[in-house]
Structure formats: structure tokens, C-alpha cells
Amino acid sequence: MATTQQPEATEHQHFGVVEIKDLENHKFIKPVKVVTNEDDIKKFLRSGACRDLLEYIQTLSDKIKSKPNSTKTQNSNEIKNIVSMLNEISVYIDNIPPLAQPMRYGNKAYRTFYQKLLDNVEELHKHLLPQSMHSSIIELSSYLMDAMGNQTRLDYGTGHELHFVVWTYCLRRIGFLKSTDEEDIVLNVFTTYLDLVRKLQRVYGLEPAGTHGVWSLDDYQFIPFIWGASQLIGNPFDIKPASVTIEKVVDQYYKEYLYIACIKYINTVKKGPFHEHSRDLFNISGAASWQKINTGMMKKFYDDVLSKVPIIQHFLFGSLISFSV
């Protein structure tokens, strides 16, 4: 785990998301895959798209620094409507039970769920967005669909999670969400999304995409560890990094902190002692502070997600987050 000394989170420079000013004349396009090899990855890592994405994730991390999930926020109508839309998608799962089939991973009923969402995703966005923003749906729909996993491989992983973050970024770019919504993007929207995809993982037995086994942070998620560590900086409950190995602490605080909720979920779905099934997370719990973990997680995200061809070869680029090789 990298513990390179970096400025405190409050010292990060934020240039903000650049909103599209003239939506009426902006040319939205269906996002496509662009990256195919290591040379493409090197270009991507130097690109404005990568810089903007990292900046956005860091901005959200800083916005929720030292703030538990129950923090009183603005909770705008836009945020409420997004949460309502995600909850509506969750009901699809309730109405499409898994098939009786002898498979460890990948229940084929997931494909029925995916098709149901595909059939409705445009209408869901039309209901969410004002008429003036409907031209952006061609891009938004692609990101939201991929944020739910892959219907061919019946899997879900960090690349799908990343596309959900990109979906919220695009909602910022078109001006549907504002800078004043950024706390809520994590504390209300992303937490609802996590509940949704964990439900998908459990009900349909989705295979982890590109898991590293006991050396993975989590078979499915990454970003809640970045944002969750930020939440725990300076927490009033004296929850230290090593505290996540204590079951009583996890049970007491998992509803308040993303990081601890991740540990709780891992302990629920994996068998055996924590230090055996999650060695990387166990080692990270030895870090000196949550600030160091937050900084290290950002570096690890850059190295293990954004720098990997198997993940970024599936990343979709459109007009709102663009890149060409």
C-alpha cells in the first residue's frame, strides 16, 4: 500500500467539472471502446479524459471527507429522482427471480433483467431529465447499462463500477447535477447504486470480473474504499484503520461509512478469517492513518484500474468524456 506523503485533502486544487453550455447544439454520440493495447493505455493515462476522471473522483472524495452517510445534505430533487430511478431498477430484480440451474456463477435470469433494463433505459432517462437534456440520453444510457455488469459474460467488476461514476460525471457535465450535489452523489446516489449492484451480485451470482482472489481489495468494487477512507478521516468515534478487523466495530458502524460497509459485505460473502480471505485489506489496516489509506487508494486505483488493459479496453468514450488514439 503506497503511503507517499501528499498534501492533506483540503489542499487539492479543484478546477471543477466543465459544464456543456450549449446543449442544443452539442453533438452527443454513442460511446465506443477505443483502448486495445498498452500503447493506448499510455496515451489514455496522459489524456484529458483520464485527468478529468481522476479530478472528479478526488473532488468527490474531498467533498465527503469526515462525513458519515447520515450527514445532513442538500438532497436536491435531482438527487431524489436519481435515487428513485435506481430503486425502480432494483424492483426489476424482485420481479425476475433466478432460474433453478446448477451453476456457481452467472444465473441466466440476469440476462432477462439486463434486457428489461435495456428496453426501459431510454424511457427512464426521459422521465429523469428535462426535455432540453434528452439529446444526451444516447451517451447516458450506454454508461448506465454497462454499470450493471455484462450480460454476455454474466460478470461484474471495477470497470462496471467506474462506468456508474462516469454516468454521474456526465450528469454533471450536462448541468443536471450541480457542484452543490457532489456530497449527495456519494452519500445518497452511490450508496443506493452499491445496494443495487450487490443485490445483482447476490441474486444472479454474477462472476467477479478480473478478480485477484485473496489479494483483491474486493472481488467487485474499488471506489467505495477511496471515498470510504476519506469519510473516516478525523472520525469522532476513534475508528482507526486497524479497527476494521474488529467485528463489533464493523457491525456498529457499517451503515455510516462506505469503507466499513465494504468490510461487512466481504465478511458476509466470504468464509474464514478476514486476514486469510482479504490479505490486501488486512495489510492495509496496518496503515498509520485514514489519510494515508485514502491517498494510497487513489494511487492503487490509478495503478490497478486505470492502467490495466483488461479493464480500460471496455471503457466507453463519447463526447462527454472523449479520447482517441
Curated annotation (Swiss-Prot):
Its EC number is 5.2.1.8. GO terms for molecular function: peptidyl-prolyl cis-trans isomerase activity; protein tyrosine phosphatase activator activity. One of its GO terms (cellular component) is protein phosphatase type 2A complex. Keywords: Cytoplasm, Isomerase, Rotamase. It comes from Dictyostelium discoideum (Social amoeba). This is Probable serine/threonine-protein phosphatase 2A activator 1. Gene3D superfamilies: 1.20.120.1150. It is found in: Cytoplasm. It is an enzyme of class 5 (isomerase).
